[in-house]
Amino acid sequence: MTKTYHIAVLPGDGIGPEVMAQASKVLDAVRQRFGLKISTSVYDVGGAAIDRHGSPLPAATVAGCEQADAILFGSVGGPKWEHLPPAEQPERGALLPLRKHFKLFSNLRPARLYQGLEDFCPLRSDIAARGFDILCVRELTGGIYFGQPKGREGQGMHERAFDTEVYHRFEIERIARIAFESARKRRSKVTSIDKANVLQSSILWREVVNGIAADYPDVALSHMYIDNATMQLIKDPSQFDVLLCSNLFGDILSDECAMITGSMGMLPSASLNEQGFGLYEPAGGSAPDIAGKNIANPIAQILSLILLLRFSLGKDDAADAIERAINQALEQGYRTADLAGDGHAIGTHEMGDIIAKFVVEGV
């Protein structure tokens, strides 16, 4: 019997509902083509939930997500809610509690320069011509952002502030396995980022990663200091496949990877727990300035659906079909405004229609 999967859909604010509608079209297309049984339920989140329910993350939304196999998340936030206390604003009041509630410890951020989009890459033309396809695997719940003690004390010239970088062996082991398993599905290369020439936490990080690597003899492992990695990403990003990073280093490198692709509209992300449950979302923001204008790029949301199909549902064939459809659309010159330059731009809805059509046709 074919298993039925259930996705909790949280469109959110700004361009979220528009781009989510395009991902839903593409999901309908893979259902049709592959006979998948995937149901969806839509829930309020972020500013939209504040307006309707008085909370950025209503209990009904959390309950709906608990009943799902994965969460497809849009985007939250906007000027309308910036007057609220920080903990009640859409970003802090919705996304962070969801990550904590579902124990999402790993963040996966693909960054790829698609053929035909080299002119949007800020790197030198000969570097961009080589292309790149990088997956940044970032540990989300440990490290200096959460380590104790942290705080400020003293006064005057003796005032000081302090944070503590703490990593446990189990935290490093589980994120390392995510990186190695991901590399097996890609080009079988992991570059682990640390500062083991200075930091005790990085020395442990490197030791543990080396130990995990023994279980993956088919995956090549190398180590790189964070300062060198930031330089190498600019010098030759094509050398990288999977980047394995701590929380702080992953925060830095994932944004650098995003920048060199040339468009936030092409960047998905996934946050996973140990059971494979995940929250999938575009890496960009809610872009309230272009909401409702049919000009937002929906590809990041559709790429987030691809990650969901791969990592939470195990439907690689459906994910591959969507990926081919996106490639076909771009190769045929279809562009939303962020990618069109001086050329012809199509709208958000049109891009969704074209990609869904190519999925059904089996390009």
From Swiss-Prot:
Source organism phylogeny: Bacteria, Pseudomonadati, Pseudomonadota, Gammaproteobacteria, Enterobacterales
Disulfide pairings: none
GO biological process, one term: L-leucine biosynthetic process
InterPro entries (UniProt xref): IsoCit/isopropylmalate_DH_CS, IsoPropMal-DH-like_dom, Isopropylmalate_DH
Reactions performed catalytically: (2R,3S)-3-isopropylmalate + NAD(+) = 4-methyl-2-oxopentanoate + CO2 + NADH
Record's protein name: 3-isopropylmalate dehydrogenase
Physiological role: Catalyzes the oxidation of 3-carboxy-2-hydroxy-4-methylpentanoate (3-isopropylmalate) to 3-carboxy-4-methyl-2-oxopentanoate. The product decarboxylates to 4-methyl-2 oxopentanoate.
Pathway: Amino-acid biosynthesis; L-leucine biosynthesis; L-leucine from 3-methyl-2-oxobutanoate: step 3/4
Organism field: Yersinia pseudotuberculosis serotype I (strain IP32953)
